[in-house]
């Protein structure tokens, strides 16, 4: 399974004229890749993610997933937003099942499996208002992965969480990735998070958004943020921002 992002460009129309948001994005992922995307605000990270998800088909170029051109959302893509977007009138297990019936034994068993994977045992019958923000985001992760998507797209899913909860969910996500080998594309503003999670870091520049640099991250798992090798990669990433003009671009 591959994900191919080919010659993708995107324009927005404004009263003052047309603005190019993305320019000539080319990138490929193989099955099981974990890629993080970072860059200054306004460089089109979230826009690119929505294009890959099939949520935006007004663009130039093409997205190919497992040989199929993507023009709309499908079971090939799972998407996790910055907010969990749970249905407040549904329980945890009903939110994970979403539009599938829990009366179906296969669905019931799959939901049970994901409840265990994201460590929500005992909260199956709870409603979103009865659980924490971190737990709600775990429900969103389970919901997105229930249908075994080819690729999971994550748009800063931990950005609004406290440091402890974010660290915990990073471990949950890595455990899922190691178990299921799901291809992941994860947008973040956090350099340490990008290095900690992924095996490739895509750095984007802005105005218009384009790929500035791809850094291979071959650190073995599990990773320590305090290790010398981790800090070396962090230095490489920061150098791209400091000397690549990215900080100025974001001002």
UniProtKB/Swiss-Prot annotation:
A GO molecular-function annotation: ATP binding
Keyword Transmembrane helix carried by entry: no
Membrane topology category: Peripheral membrane protein
Compartments, record wording: Cell membrane
GO cellular component labels: plasma membrane
Catalysed reactions, semicolon-separated: ATP + H2O + aliphatic sulfonate-[sulfonate-binding protein]Side 1 = ADP + phosphate + aliphatic sulfonateSide 2 + [sulfonate-binding protein]Side 1
Annotated positions binding ATP: 39-46
Enzyme Commission number(s) from the entry: 7.6.2.14
UniProt family annotation: Belongs to the ABC transporter superfamily. Aliphatic sulfonates importer (TC 3.A.1.17.2) family.
Subunit text: The complex is composed of two ATP-binding proteins (SsuB), two transmembrane proteins (SsuC) and a solute-binding protein (SsuA).
Protein name per its UniProtKB record: Aliphatic sulfonates import ATP-binding protein SsuB
Species annotation: Bacillus cereus (strain ZK / E33L)
Source lineage: Bacteria, Bacillati, Bacillota, Bacilli, Bacillales
């Amino acid at each position: 399974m591959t994900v191919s992002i080919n010659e993708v460009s995107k324009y927005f129309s404004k009263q003052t004229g047309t603005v190019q948001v993305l320019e000539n994005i080319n990138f490929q992922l193989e099955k099981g890749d974990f890629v993080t995307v970072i860059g200054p605000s306004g460089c089109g990270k979230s826009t690119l993610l929505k294009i890959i998800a099939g949520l935006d088909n007004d663009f130039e170029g093409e997205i190919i997933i497992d040989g199929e051109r993507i023009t709309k959302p499908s079971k090939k893509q799972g998407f996790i937003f910055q907010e969990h977007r749970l249905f407040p009138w549904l329980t945890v297990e009903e939110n994970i099942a979403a539009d599938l019936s829990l009366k179906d034994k296969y669905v019931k068993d799959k939901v049970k499996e994901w409840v265990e994977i994201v460590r929500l045992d005992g909260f199956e019958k709870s409603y979103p208002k009865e659980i924490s923000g971190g737990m709600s985001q775990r429900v969103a992760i389970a919901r997105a992965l229930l249908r075994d998507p080819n690729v999971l797209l994550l748009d800063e899913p931990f950005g609004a969480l406290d440091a402890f909860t974010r660290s915990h969910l990073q471990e949950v996500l890595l455990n899922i990735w190691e178990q299921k080998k799901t291809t992941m594309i994860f947008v973040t503003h956090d350099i340490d998070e990008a290095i900690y999670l992924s095996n490739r870091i895509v750095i984007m520049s802005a105005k218009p958004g384009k790929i500035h640099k791809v850094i291979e991250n071959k650190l073995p798992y599990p990773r320590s943020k305090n290790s010398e090798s981790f800090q070396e990669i962090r230095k490489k990433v920061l150098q791209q921002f400091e000397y690549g003009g990215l900080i100025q671009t974001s001002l």
